[in-house]
Each structure stands twice: as C-alpha cells, then as structure tokens.
Amino acid sequence: MIELDFGSIGLAVTNWIIIAALVVTLLVSLRKTQSVDLLPVPVSQELKGLAILAIVFAHISYMLVTDNHFLYPLSIAAGVGVDIFLFMSGFGLTVGMLKKRMPAMEFYRRRLIKVFIPLWVVLILLFAVDAVFLQHYYAPLYMLQSLLGWFPRAAAFDDVNSPFWYISWLLMFYILFPLLFMPQRPWLTAILLAVIANIVAVTDPLDLQVDWLHRLHTNAFSLGMIVAWALRESKGSRNPLVEKLKAFRDGGAPLVRYLLLLVLALVAGYLACHNNASDWPHLAQALHAARFDESFFIGQATSLLTMAALIVIFSLKRMEFKFLYLFGVYSFETYLLHWPLMARYDVFFHHLPAWLAPLIWLPAFIAIGWLLQKITTPLGAWFDKHI
C-alpha cells in the first residue's frame, strides 16, 4: 500500500481540491439531453460512468493507499457502483430479449464476444507483463481458471486482478438468464434468478473466499429485469406508467421535479454514508432477532436504495453529463485494468501530489480504454464472423 504525503495543505484540502475539480468538469460537460426515453443509452452510459468512478475511488481509498479518509466521500459507494452495473445488465438484456427472443446458444456466443474477448486480452497482457517486469509467475491452473472466468477469491495484491470476482458472479446470471427467460413473465424469471442468487450466496456451497461480496449483490440484476418489464411498450400501444413519468419529466411543474430530485439526491447521499449495521441499531437488532444476517441485509438494502434513487434522478433529469457518459463508454475497459495498473505499475501516486494523482489517472483510464477497444473491437468482429 502507498503512504501518501499531503504536504502543507493536509488531507481535507486535498479531498476538496479533487472534489472541486470533478464538479467543475461535470458542469463544463453538461449538455441538454436529446433523448425522449426514460432510460436511453446515454443515461445508461452515464450511470455506468458514475458506477466505475465510485469503484475506482473506493479501490484507491481502501486498497491502494494507507489512509482510507483519502477521497472521502467519493470512496464510499463501490457497492452501489457494482449494483448499478448488475442492474443495467439485467435491464439491457431484458429489453433486448423482449424485442427479439434469442436462442440460448446465440446469447452465449454474443456474451462470449462481449465479455471474454476483452477479458482474455487483458489477462494475457497481465500474465506476460507481470512475468517480464515483476518476475511474478502464475500457476498454469490459476491462469486456465482465470481464462475461463473463474475467480473464487479477491486478494488485492496476490490475484492477477482482485476485482475480477465480479466476472464470475455475472457469468452465473448470464448462464441462467436465457434458460429461465419467459417473454410473457420476465418478472417471474427475475424472481427465480434472485432466489437462486440468494441461495448460492447464503449457502456458499463451494466455500469461496469471495462469497462475502456475492452476498452483497444478489438482487440488483433481477431488479433491472423487473424495471425493464414495467417500462416495456408493445407495438401499437403505450405504457401508461411510461407516459406518466415522461409527462412528469417534461411537463409544466419543474419546481416539483427539482424538489424531488433534490430529496432523492439527499437520500442517496445519506444512505451511502450510513450503509453499516451500526448505523441502524434498532433495525439491526430486529434482524438479528429474526435470525437474519443484519450486516449483509442492511449493506445490500442501503446499496439498492441508493442505486434506485440515483437511477430515478438520472431518468428524470433533462441534462446530460458528457464526462460521465465518456467514462460509461469505457467503463468495462476501466474495470478490467484500473486495479492492476494502480496496484503494481503506479507512477502517479508515487511521484505526484496526492491531489493530482487521481486527476491524472482518470484521463489515463480513458486513453487506455480507448486503446483497448481499438484492439478488442476488431477481434470481436472476427470472432463474430467465424464462430
């Protein structure tokens, strides 16, 4: 871990400089939205951008540096970020399946191209550069398991990339989704997936070191499916719920909408800051008496409620944050590479002021993500043509 030197300005001022720089960047990138849908692609990308930033900041604060007050409060919502990714995945897959049913094998082929091609490129790169520059050699079985998407643990400095635990968890949903999907009852598929995910996480049949992370993220994917089902519109008919929400967003009561957005933002901020059982002692006591695991229940509930508030905010706002959109476009690439780059090959935190290092890493992730897409996109097209 890196011990930061905050110099004469101190930790608090360092955090405020970073926050101010990000706020200015967000405001400069603000544009009037061109979309009319509630959850169009630009909004999805903005949410993914927000999610990956929350994850990156948390990994810096709680894993990379010794002082976990660094980047507070930007660093407290990694779990919310993971839930946003799972929610958007469930939402997007359900929207696609409701428009055009896809056979299971075709679904798997497309997931293989979208997820595994970038994953394989990054893994091969990391295995090679770690061996050449760090003389760190991974066991053949470990490399094979990684290439198959199996990451049963999340050891920050021992695994090739500890955040890859998410890949294995996501693959479970991907494997089950086309097998259980019911076009007339996607809500039932969502419930079945949530039940399976909770059973797997609670029973932990394989006794996985990473299960504590699985238990915090069992329901977001299914919630995305349910929202997609609730907002779907059939040919020749309009969805009354969608029409009411659009009318509220675009209608003549902006003050009410602004007040709602403000309240939701405050709720999201409060829940993100109070996400432990110790923050809700009476609820924790009641859950414990009912033989629920209060830590996981409260941790997941506050994360999902925070996520829900943010999704409503982004759906009802009439402006776009191009900065978040850009990070959303390269969110998967940033996810794949940010931790090993910072943990093993960092130069910025070691040689730059603490306030400047994360502000340099962020555009670096965009540039690296752009480069990785330039490599993986033609590879994916080749696989799509020949497989």
Regions found by a protein language model. Name each.
Residues 169, 216-220, 302-306:
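Hydrophobic alpha-helical segments and helix-packing faces
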Residues 1-196, 330, 350-387:
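Membrane-cytosol interface segments of multi-pass membrane proteins
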Residues 7-22, 79, 87, 122, ...:
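Alpha-helical transmembrane segments of multi-pass integral membrane proteins
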Residues 62-64, 130, 213, 229, ...:
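Active-site environment of divalent metal-dependent phosphoester hydrolases
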Residues 59, 93, 126-130, 201-202, ...:
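Structural signal for membrane-spanning alpha-helices in multi-pass inner-membrane proteins
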Residues 4-18, 44, 48, 54, ...:
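Aromatic-enriched alpha-helical transmembrane segments of multi-pass intramembrane proteins
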